[in-house]
Swiss-Prot record:
An annotated Gene Ontology molecular function: N-acyltransferase activity
EC number from the UniProt entry: 2.3.1.191
Lipid biosynthesis listed as a keyword: yes
Taxonomic classification: Bacteria, Pseudomonadati, Pseudomonadota, Alphaproteobacteria, Hyphomicrobiales
Biological source species: Rhizobium johnstonii (strain DSM 114642 / LMG 32736 / 3841) (Rhizobium leguminosarum bv. viciae)
The protein's annotated pathway: Bacterial outer membrane biogenesis; LPS lipid A biosynthesis
Sequence similarity: Belongs to the transferase hexapeptide repeat family. LpxD subfamily.
This protein's name: UDP-3-O-acylglucosamine N-acyltransferase
InterPro entries per the UniProt record, alphabetical: Hexapep, Hexapep_transf_CS, LpxD, Trimer_LpxA-like_sf, UDP_GlcNAc_AcTrfase_non-rep
Function: Catalyzes the N-acylation of UDP-3-O-acylglucosamine using 3-hydroxyacyl-ACP as the acyl donor. Is involved in the biosynthesis of lipid A, a phosphorylated glycolipid that anchors the lipopolysaccharide to the outer membrane of the cell.
Length: 354
């Protein structure tokens, strides 16, 4: 890749310094003073780059790799050619992620749309709003009456913070986001165009059509949650919609009213979660999954992409398909269906039907 003008390389660290930061072991101290500035995939890592490996499938790429360091666990160290410095880590993937954050700290947050260091003159801030020291408000942002913004938080250009909203410290609200009827903890990241706290989808059928049900709950977002671009999280109807600590939500996810999501979950793009569903801690949900309202998903569940979840799921299981079922059962069903389809497509004697 050519020089990236959006994220400039780090000024450089010695490998010994990087190893200490990562809690990794630099195998050969002769390389302690080698300077590294960036992270890169093994396929194109060059001098000054750090890469990592997770399996023996990387053997061929290592033979031609020119990286200044390879992060791996002890079981894979024998794969690395002698000309490449090795850093041993019990979790190479996490160590590589930490290295990336060290080299490119600005990339850990939404891109700033201005160089403002305080409050832009064009921002609209209600006089009753309370902003702690170090809050940055970019051009054309709007902050409503009695809102509270914690120290070190950045409010992006053209974003809207509604009345009485509370946002904790060291948060990043990207350009174009809107947050109403919500309470946010510390270290929360909201990406561009996300919509937090709007009406939930609630109607009662009546003789003259659909009667709107008032949505008078809130959205509660706990510490260190990250919410992707154009994701929508509805406020509760009578109760709250809650996103648990450390949960990461991808782009274009829809979360309905009263949904309860536990701690440290990962939810991939285009997932739809209907109202009042309860999701435990550490749940991983693949892309385009649909989850029925009022179901309960246990701790540690993993759900394959494009599944349709219509019933409760027991903790710790892997599930897939529509309707959602244990993953092995789903894969077996798919294999049988494909086998039958192939058989139907053949004439006696092995000739293909037209």
């Amino acid at each position: 890749m050519e020089q990236n003008v959006f994220f400039l390389p780090h000024e450089g660290l010695k490998l010994a310094e990087l190893a200490e930061f990562l809690g990794a072991e630099l195998v050969n101290s002769d390389y302690a003073d080698v300077i590294v500035r960036s992270v890169a995939p093994i396929s194109r890592a060059r001098a000054g780059d750090v890469c990592y490996i997770l399996s023996r499938r990387s053997r061929d790429e290592l033979a031609t790799c020119e990286a200044s360091a390879v992060i791996c666990d002890k079981a894979l160290a024998d794969l690395v050619p002698q000309h490449l410095p090795v850093m041993l880590s019990s979790n190479p993937h996490a160590a590589f992620a930490m290295a990336g954050g060290l080299f490119y700290p600005a990339a850990l947050r939404p891109v700033a749309f201005s160089g403002e260091s305080e409050i832009a003159p064009s921002a609209v801030i209600d006089p009753s709003a309370r902003l702690e020291k170090g809050v940055i408000v970019e051009p054309m942002a709007v902050i409503g009456a009695h809102a509270e913004i914690g120290e070190g938080t950045r409010i992006g250009a053209h974003s809207i913070i509604g009345p009485n909203v509370k946002i904790g410290r060291d948060c990043s609200i990207a350009a174009g986001a809107s947050i109403i009827c919500a309470l946010l903890g510390n270290g929360v990241i909201i990406h561009n165009g996300a919509r937090i706290g709007q009406d939930g989808f609630g109607y009662a059928p009546g003789p003259r059509g659909m009667i709107k049900i008032v949505q008078i709950g809130r959205v509660i977002i706990q510490d260190n949650v990250e919410i992707g671009a154009n994701t929508t999280i509805d406020r509760g109807a009578m109760d709250d919609t809650v996103i648990g600590e450390g949960t990461k939500i991808d782009n274009q996810v829809q979360i309905g009213h009263n949904v309860q999501i536990g701690r440290h979950c990962a939810i991939v793009a285009l997932v739809g979660i209907a109202g009042s569903a309860k999701i435990g801690n550490g749940v991983q949900i693949g892309g385009q999954v649909g989850i029925k309202g009022h179901v309960t998903i246990g701790d540690g569940v993993q759900i394959a992409a494009q599944s349709g979840i219509m019933t409760d799921l027991a903790a710790g299981g892997q599930y897939g398909g529509t309707p959602g079922r244990p993953l092995n059962d789903y894969l077996r069903d798919v294999a049988q269906q494909m086998s039958k389809t192939k058989l139907r497509g053949k004439k006696p004697g092995g000739e293909q039907n037209d």
